[in-house]
Amino acid sequence: MNLRASLTATLMLAIVTFLSACDTTGSPGPGVTRIISTTSFGMCMGYCRTQLEITPVKAVLVREPGGRGAPTLPVQRFERPLAPGEWQSLAQSAASARFAGLPETIGCPDCADGGAESLSVTDARGTKAVNFDHGKDVTELQPLLNQVRDIRASLTPKE
């Protein structure tokens, strides 16, 4: 092979490699390592903020007091191991979530004390996140959002 053909082949291989590495889906990659969901309410009494962190082995929910009349409440922490296959299902839903095209904030989270919610997914390429009105559906994220909300409900104490 002459030098020109060799350089052309090398250049083509580099272009194909570069293009195949581009993320055109806007979805987290298959190596999802963490999913975080938060809720917050600006004008509330009692536990006003929560953070749910889900990793391949467990789910941890932290509830923090805030608002009016709650400064003496302790921070609460609840955790449970994930059931067999639960992380795989979450990671698959996270990898299928369509963050591309979504703005960083949807609607007006916590306006008129409706509460705010967020969802973020971390993989080897970084973190994709979105904030939105508490309890609202986000079609592009819905399967994952449903699973995360179910885990939050399972860890939240009945008051």
Briefly describe each language-model feature range.
Residues 2-7, 22-44, 49, 78, ...:
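Short, well-ordered, aromatic-rich surface patches in folded extracellular/luminal domains
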Residues 9-18:
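Bacterial N-terminal signal peptides
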Residues 27, 38-71:
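N-terminal secretory signal peptides
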Residues 63-101:
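A short-motif feature that recognizes glycine-rich, charge-decorated loops
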